[in-house]
Amino acid sequence: MTEDKSQVKIRFFTREKDELLHVQDTPMYAPISLKRYGLSEIVNHLLGSEKPVPFDFLIEGELLRTSLHDYLTKKGLSSEASLNVEYTRAILPPSYLNSFSNEDWVSSLDVGDGSKHIISGSYDGIVRTWDLSGNVQKQYSGHSGPIRAVKYISNTRLVSAGNDRTLRLWKTKNDDLKLTSQQQAQEDDDDEVNIEDGKTLAILEGHKAPVVSIDVSDNSRILSASYDNSIGFWSTIYKEMTVVDPLEDINNPNNKISTAARKRRKLTMKDGTIRRRAPLSLLESHTAPVEQVIFDSTDNTVGYSVSQDHTIKTWDLVTARCIDTRTTSYSLLSIAQLSTLNLLACGSSARHITLHDPRVGASSKVTQQQLIGHKNFVSSLDTCPENEYILCSGSHDGTVKVWDVRSTSPMYTITREDKSVQKGVNDKVFAVKWAEKVGIISAGQDKKIQINKGDNIFKN
């Protein structure tokens, strides 16, 4: 096969909703030397576009990252083959927008649905809310150690968790977020109207080691992952949880609490108005620290967790039982769900991301694909709000990478913008969040919250 002269029969098609991006369904011949740019020129010519639209191309569901010649060679096909080539809008580079300075390492980030406010959890033990100009709107103090996870519950509540082994529910104010009728009824019932913004609404106790991950469902439930190998299942409705007596915990001689921890607990008890609650249940099956837990985005009675014990577990939250376990060959540190694709993306200590289908039976090791490109632990994952195939990952190698799961290599790599960052010294990324109206937010060891463009990245 001569690459410069040979041609191959192709048929272009697209699943784009915009009818103006649809070409006529007519087969044509194209040089097999063409790559993405050349194919994009052909499609734009067929569309008669005044302003060229950048496209990506897929053949049999696989992103084309080489020439047509190389693709045919890889698949063992001749130029006499006929190819159905799908085209889709290309993702634009996630250009740098802004950075905010924090007092200490930033471990966790969140943005409420439809909100333009960022919340961060820091190793200095403080939760902060930020506007997009980098101004701190509010600080929430109460944890007695580093914070490892933060999440919005509603526009008047958020939850945090940390190394002090507790979760805290906080009163906040975010006018960008709207309450559901259930949330409004709950807050009216709990008489939170008179509680000051920034105050702790409740302390949730039950874990025996640092709590490093939390997730929130739309039915007033919280999941927490802990280094005590367990997962906590909680409610934001106080009357559904058992009251905890902190004095019983402190005075129990069999309880292995350090002297310093006992002193801290007694200090926090000075505010007798703070509710203390126990979990609805503790889910136990992991044999090593649990790194992250999430709700199924389409069924809040199901949860997924990953652990240093190399497993992905599926949980029935109604019965509090593990119903499926997948075993890998490496510690798993992060997880995100691509719900429309029925896939779980899992970041590992082996530096790659694996894609698993939770519907497939656990009798065999099932790995759909590995995304390879990071050079250190993959500590955080989040999905693109605009495209079901796109996700981003944060790593201890100091980068955030943007992936299309139809390709095994990253589309883009985001590096730390702060000039004081030293590679391998203070560049670890601990958290990423891809938020609509904000962008790709990342943070970590450099004490910076960095924002890169991630909104409207499929538009010209």
UniProtKB/Swiss-Prot annotation:
Chief localisation class: nucleus
Question: Is Protein biosynthesis among the key words of this record?
Answer: no
Under the heading InterPro entries, the entry gives: G-protein_beta_WD-40_rep, NLE, WD40/YVTN_repeat-like_dom_sf, WD40_repeat_CS, WD40_repeat_dom_sf, WD40_rpt, WDR12/Ytm1
> Which processes are annotated in GO (biological process)?
chromosome organization; maturation of 5.8S rRNA from tricistronic rRNA transcript (SSU-rRNA, 5.8S rRNA, LSU-rRNA); maturation of LSU-rRNA from tricistronic rRNA transcript (SSU-rRNA, 5.8S rRNA, LSU-rRNA); protein-RNA complex remodeling; ribosomal large subunit biogenesis; rRNA processing
Any single Pfam family the record assigns to this protein: WD40
Q: Transferase among the record's keywords? A: no
The observed outcome of changing G398D is:
In ytm1-1; abrogates binding to ERB1 and impairs 27S pre-rRNA processing and 66S pre-ribosome maturation
Write one Gene Ontology MF term: ribonucleoprotein complex binding
Query: Per UniProt, which keywords does this protein have?
Result: Nucleus, Repeat, Ribosome biogenesis, rRNA processing, WD repeat
- Chain positions of WD repeats: 101-140, 142-180, 206-244, 285-325, 327-366, 373-413, 424-460
Region span, Ubiquitin-like (UBL) domain: 8-89
Q: Where in the cell is it found?
A: Nucleus, Nucleolus; Nucleus, Nucleoplasm
Tell me the domain of life.
Eukaryota
Entry's Gene Ontology cellular component terms:
nucleolus; nucleoplasm; nucleus; PeBoW complex; preribosome, large subunit precursor
User: What are the start and end residues of every segment in region (Sufficient for interaction with ERB1 and association with 66S pre-ribosomes)?
Assistant: 99-460
CDD domains tied to this protein? WD40
What family does the Swiss-Prot or TrEMBL record give for this protein?
Belongs to the WD repeat WDR12/YTM1 family.
Assembly and partners are described as: Component of the NOP7 complex, composed of ERB1, NOP7 and YTM1. The complex is held together by ERB1, which interacts with NOP7 via its N-terminal domain and with YTM1 via a high-affinity interaction between the seven-bladed beta-propeller domains of the 2 proteins. The NOP7 complex associates with the 66S pre-ribosome. Interacts (via UBL domain) with MDN1 (via VWFA/MIDAS domain).
Q: What else is known?
A: Present with 6670 molecules/cell in log phase SD medium.
Job of this protein = Component of the NOP7 complex, which is required for maturation of the 25S and 5.8S ribosomal RNAs and formation of the 60S ribosome.
Protein name in the entry: Ribosome biogenesis protein YTM1
Organism, by scientific name, is: Saccharomyces cerevisiae (strain ATCC 204508 / S288c)
